[in-house]
UniProtKB/Swiss-Prot annotation:
Monomer. Component of the NHEJ repair enzyme with mKu. Residues 740-759 are annotated as: Disordered. The gene is ligD. Binds 4 Mn(2+); 2 Mn(2+) for polymerase/primase activity, 1 each for 3-phosphoesterase and ligase. The keyword Magnesium does not apply. NCBIfam families: LigD_PE_dom, ligD_pol, NHEJ_ligase_lig, PRK09632.1. This is Multifunctional non-homologous end joining DNA repair protein LigD. InterPro entries: DNA_ligase_ATP-dep_C, DNA_ligase_ATP-dep_cent, LigD_ligase_dom, LigD_PE_domain, LigD_pol_dom, MtLigD_Pol-like, NA-bd_OB-fold, NHEJ_LigD. Residues 1-411 are annotated as: Not required for ligase activity. Residues 747-759 have a biased composition (Basic and acidic residues). Residues 13-16, 26, 53-55, 63-67, 71, 83-88, 104, 137, 215-220, 227-235 bind DNA. GO terms for molecular function: ATP binding; DNA binding; DNA ligase (ATP) activity; DNA-directed DNA polymerase activity; exonuclease activity; metal ion binding.
Amino acid sequence: MGSASEQRVTLTNADKVLYPATGTTKSDIFDYYAGVAEVMLGHIAGRPATRKRWPNGVDQPAFFEKQLALSAPPWLSRATVAHRSGTTTYPIIDSATGLAWIAQQAALEVHVPQWRFVAEPGSGELNPGPATRLVFDLDPGEGVMMAQLAEVARAVRDLLADIGLVTFPVTSGSKGLHLYTPLDEPVSSRGATVLAKRVAQRLEQAMPALVTSTMTKSLRAGKVFVDWSQNSGSKTTIAPYSLRGRTHPTVAAPRTWAELDDPALRQLSYDEVLTRIARDGDLLERLDADAPVADRLTRYRRMRDASKTPEPIPTAKPVTGDGNTFVIQEHHARRPHYDFRLERDGVLVSWAVPKNLPDNTSVNHLAIHTEDHPLEYATFEGAIPSGEYGAGKVIIWDSGTYDTEKFHDDPHTGEVIVNLHGGRISGRYALIRTNGDRWLAHRLKNQKDQKVFEFDNLAPMLATHGTVAGLKASQWAFEGKWDGYRLLVEADHGAVRLRSRSGRDVTAEYPQLRALAEDLADHHVVLDGEAVVLDSSGVPSFSQMQNRGRDTRVEFWAFDLLYLDGRALLGTRYQDRRKLLETLANATSLTVPELLPGDGAQAFACSRKHGWEGVIAKRRDSRYQPGRRCASWVKDKHWNTQEVVIGGWRAGEGGRSSGVGSLLMGIPGPGGLQFAGRVGTGLSERELANLKEMLAPLHTDESPFDVPLPARDAKGITYVKPALVAEVRYSEWTPEGRLRQSSWRGLRPDKKPSEVVRE
């Protein structure tokens, strides 16, 4: 699957009328499928899509299309199914762009089976899997009305409820009703067919005057045919939310059971369905809750079995960000090589480089473009078991950050030029695609670097989120993660200046830290550390830091030394900077917390015992890279926290009805904020009142979010300019990129919105 920038669909013949009776155009169809993508994709993702196309409109002949054409875009997911007549490659529609392609093809109808493809462990090859749901097609015989269909539907529902299954109704957009039932455990298509047939036969026995389970058309007059056969692995059903190629643009529309009690029940048109989605969301939300909507890590996951390999295999969809880390891993596989990975759009774009990157400009080295890897892989070291994909030992050879000059990794004319800043390797490199997945890696001449050490332009080095449990003390040092505000401090022979992580001069905001000037009066130093306020147990408290007064005791805990008496230390190894820092602390009253004992697991347990926020692991040979988020520093927290940008607010209810009830959260992305959900828990009345006052001058009519919000979240909101940063605690990220069970921790005036990234 290609990157978002590679997935484009151009609408042609937009004004072409496809439904003459209503004047509905191809552009209308395009807009419809874009509008239903969020709710429809879960019900078709992972399944082979058969299309029924009306390129010249519904008043002209249509045709079914199964085989994916050679002209189909390369980013479209696909898989092959063996039939009696041969093999067929089907598209798998698992993205909004895929649905846009459906509309561009004038494929008004999308038909899918009740099973999904499953990946073979190791190879990642997709093969037909078991059924994940049942479907019953209630087909009315001559003279049967919708009220009779509804009566049979309720009988099916009650029969399935007796065996613990829930049922969801869908008006088919044609004449009948479809009933869907999610299966707690997938079963073979044959097993699903047998079960569905038994249900239909039992219903026929209970309601012989109204129901038939027999396919013979001559026996259907005045009855409802409960078609159980569409559960067969070789059959398909019109997908929920699909348009129908009839005179009017009706839709296979999910309904409520209450609606089936309405004598005036009828089929719905596409514009009615869009209105309902905006109001009600997806009525089939529980049908395909585990739908495997594809993302840039789909191929990576298919090639690995989480029960057999220690490699990180995240289930959540990667979130686009602007991180710029790189890692080179020494991979002792069957064919030893190096893996070069660049963080890009929420994943690690990866190449296997047999001879590593060249160390001079006179040679080129082969690089093989491989599957995107998760960001967590940047800190992975370990042994992949024999028999698994990529079996062998993986060791981090180098890591750091990079600057981008050019980044085009499209399937045809790829070219990437980056400037690496690592511990063992640095400089400008070009990777140029030559044929397919084969690239050439070339070292370029460096442009003159005129950077000098200036405190006013200095930004703190940042850590990547990861797990420290497998890290060894021989290579890593472990510090406590303190729940305070990050500060850079310059003390110059009796004068002191403080700068926040965002670059603001905050010297006046910390009168309690003026003593640093006297403590370090004999030196000119630049320190990196944390301003903390301790609770009664001696543990840094973010809440007390937030609500501190001028008389509150604030301490500065130093953890890095960047400059000492005329010598810049940015290029010095961490373990050497640490020794200098400890020497400085021994000669002054500077507070330098001790390193945590043992390997990563022991350090993590120690920090938990003391009630600290977590652990920061730092490679002992790492250099300090200002303003960069690097894999050579890893943070691992005992609870999940996330910085967010406030993009709007919703009025409260009850006691909060006159003010802010909850805040809309976002993570900055290329097109605006990426919606991350709402937070209201943990906000005190005082904080709510202060927030309302702070947000008032930021009100705007324009949404700061990159896509329209779901209907349930967009109701009754006031948008604001994305200027305020906050921090929340949460239980997990959902597959849709939302924070689950979020609770408020406080504003982060020390952070800029542009600095916020998904942890």
